[in-house]
Amino acid sequence: MSRSLKKGPFVANHLLKKVQKLNDLDEKQVIKTWSRSSVIIPIMIGHTISIHNGKEHIPLYITDLMVGHKLGEFAPTRTFKGHIKKDKKSKR
């Protein structure tokens, strides 16, 4: 079930305030956030936001094609290192 249109997209208040402050000052700084569930909105375009993946912050430059997606979609939390080539247990 999707979010109601009358509510609007979810953006964490602290993140929204930081983006608006940088827009007012006309500055470009890296914004560090742990809010992976926040939706990218048009006022974020052109900013670099560092998203926490559970271990480190991954910098992400926001473009117009990302609007409507969540920040967490662009910072994967799991790393796949590949299957073991010579695994004798799985052959049994």
UniProtKB/Swiss-Prot annotation:
Main location (coarse class): plastid
UniProt cross-references to HAMAP family, sorted A to Z: Ribosomal_uS19
This protein's record includes keyword rRNA-binding: yes
Pfam families the UniProt entry points to: Ribosomal_S19
Cellular location(s): Plastid, Chloroplast
Species lineage: Eukaryota, Viridiplantae, Chlorophyta, Ulvophyceae, OUU clade
Name this polypeptide is given: Small ribosomal subunit protein uS19c
Family, similarity comment: Belongs to the universal ribosomal protein uS19 family.
GO BP term (any one): ribosomal small subunit assembly
A cellular component annotation (GO) from this entry: chloroplast
Family annotation (InterPro entries): Ribosomal_uS19 (IPR002222), Ribosomal_uS19_bac-type (IPR005732), Ribosomal_uS19_CS (IPR020934), Ribosomal_uS19_SF (IPR023575)
Keyword tags: Chloroplast, Plastid, Ribonucleoprotein, Ribosomal protein, RNA-binding, rRNA-binding
Keyword Ribosomal protein attached: yes
Coiled-coil segments: none
Classification via NCBIfam families: rpsS_bact
MF terms (GO), sorted A to Z: rRNA binding; structural constituent of ribosome
Known function: Protein S19 forms a complex with S13 that binds strongly to the 16S ribosomal RNA.
